[in-house]
Amino acid sequence: NRVFAMMFNQRTNCVYRKMHELVTSGDLGAIKRVNWIITDWYRTQSYYDSGDWRATWEGEGGGVLLNQCPHNLDLIQWICGMPSKVQAFCHEGKWHDIEVEDDVTAYLEYPNGATGVFITSTADAPGTNRFEITLEKGKLVCENNVLTLHELEVSEREFCKTAKGGFDKPPCHVKEVETDGLNEQHVGVLRAFAGRILH
């Protein structure tokens, strides 16, 4: 009879909550592809030199994946599900004089055959934070904390099989997705944790 929680506060962000809602509702069909380029974690050598523990296996236990990206890794599996296979190139000290990874490109495969990539680095300037989820009936794009839906009038699979022209494309409507605007972060997670204990 124990209650356990982890502080994955980005799950309270209104944009990511809306992405989770839209994907898990099934209204947009199954996921076909996932792409997250999250390279806006730029760090200088001075940052890494500021403490002997930084960017070491003993002091931090890892690099960009563990230090900068744990919330992104949580979000990609929360929203898209757990991949069944992961292959990755993790480059240790590629751009900085450090012993842990500062550049990662991961390839993901999901149980339904969907594929994806997760790309991160602490050496891209300017960096990018763009999260795309392509589904059977559209695409979600999250960039600069704005969520856009590219919604197809008909499922891509159905259109592919019934379209008469070889270069036809399914009609698509693009709109910014409204959210509730709430972003409770740590307070929201702590409130939920306390509520679970008390009730």
PLM regions with names:
Residues I31-V34, V117-T120, C142-N144:
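Beta-strand scaffold of nucleotide-dependent catalytic cores
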